[in-house]
């Protein structure tokens, strides 16, 4: 764990101090012993008439700002990025990631600077530039995958719909096979959290946050970073639109499950093609490069660049901090109910 002592600020009786409010009034610093202590201090005095508590209360971002003052010059080559895609049995239809009932039968993970590593369940002779790990069963496959993951410790994992499907399915499937919280091995700190929400207003979606690993979904990144609506956001359509390329065609087999049962070699090639297409999209579009530049400029997490509130709050906080100005107290807004005749 990281020991950090954040500060808050209160109005000063002195005529001048190193810190000032947004309106120029001098402030005194209040040194707190921990982030928990800082939260309690703010909660205790917030909203009390005549007592103002100044200072930014997103302590992760104040820590980054204190730890890395000034402009951050980052080395993009030092950031380890990989594209991930998994395949599951689908005899009973498309598997639900929140339940993860079906067996994982292939995983491809492609470092941006290394060969693709494929974990599968059968013999495969390929001329493509891949490293193939032939596993005895699904438990062996997931064990080998976790071992590789922990050996590499990628900073960013991307892929097409990787956040809502691949990572959610993997985490739930690992827990189903190896016990509750076994998926936490995918975090360098053995810590995670999950949240559920309705996507598009109706689709129940579960997302895992693996502490220490940034999951940056290329589908969401593409949606955010392009300025035209597409007819479809399936990888096959977008790859054809942007690159003139498509996913591997298996129409002669009718379904992905039939392909898996009858031509496992082609099934693995299909899996590999998906991660390669995402990497080629990034080579052309550079959206991950842009995300990194934005995050280091704002001193925030990569995922914060997807929204506007945290991103701009953090930029404003750092700008004001350089002027010796502390962010003003938050005001609670009462919700008024209006009767409509």
Predicted regions mapped to residue ranges:
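The two-metal-ion catalytic cores of nucleic-acid processing enzymes
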Residues: 1-219, 225-341
């Amino acid at each position: 764990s990281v020991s950090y002592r954040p500060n808050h600020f209160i109005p000063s009786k002195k005529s001048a101090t190193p810190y000032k409010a947004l309106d120029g009034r001098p402030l005194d610093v209040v040194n707190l012993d921990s982030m928990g202590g800082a939260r309690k201090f703010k909660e205790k005095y917030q909203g009390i008439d005549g007592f103002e508590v100044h200072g930014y209360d997103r302590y992760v971002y104040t820590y980054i700002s204190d730890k890395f003052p000034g402009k951050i010059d980052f080395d993009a080559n030092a950031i380890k990025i990989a594209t991930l895609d998994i395949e599951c049995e689908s005899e009973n239809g498309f598997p639900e990631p929140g339940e993860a009932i079906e067996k994982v039968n292939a995983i491809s993970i492609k470092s941006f600077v290394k060969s693709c590593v494929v974990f599968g369940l059968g013999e495969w002779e390929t001329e493509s530039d891949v490293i193939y790990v032939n596993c005895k069963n699904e438990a062996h496959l997931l064990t080998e995958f976790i071992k590789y993951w922990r050996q590499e410790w990628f900073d960013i994992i991307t892929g097409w719909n990787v956040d809502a499907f691949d990572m959610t399915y993997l985490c739930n499937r690992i827990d189903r096979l190896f016990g509750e919280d076994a998926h936490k091995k995918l975090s360098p700190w053995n810590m995670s959290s999950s949240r559920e929400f309705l996507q598009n207003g109706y689709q129940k979606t579960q997302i895992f946050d693996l502490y220490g690993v940034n999951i940056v979904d290329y589908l969401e990144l593409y949606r955010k970073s392009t300025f035209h609506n597409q007819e479809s956001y399936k990888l096959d359509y977008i790859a054809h639109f942007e690159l003139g390329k498509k996913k591997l065609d298996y129409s002669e087999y009718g379904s992905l499950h039939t392909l898996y049962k009858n031509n496992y070699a082609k099934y693995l090639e299909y899996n590999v093609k998906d991660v390669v297409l995402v990497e080629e999209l990034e080579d052309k579009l550079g959206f991950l490069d842009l995300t990194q530049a934005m995050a280091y400029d704002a001193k925030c997490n990569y995922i914060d660049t997807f929204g506007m509130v945290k991103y701009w709050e953090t930029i404003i906080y750092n700008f004001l901090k350089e002027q010796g100005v502390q962010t003003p107290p938050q005001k609670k807004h009462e919700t008024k109910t209006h009767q409509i005749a």
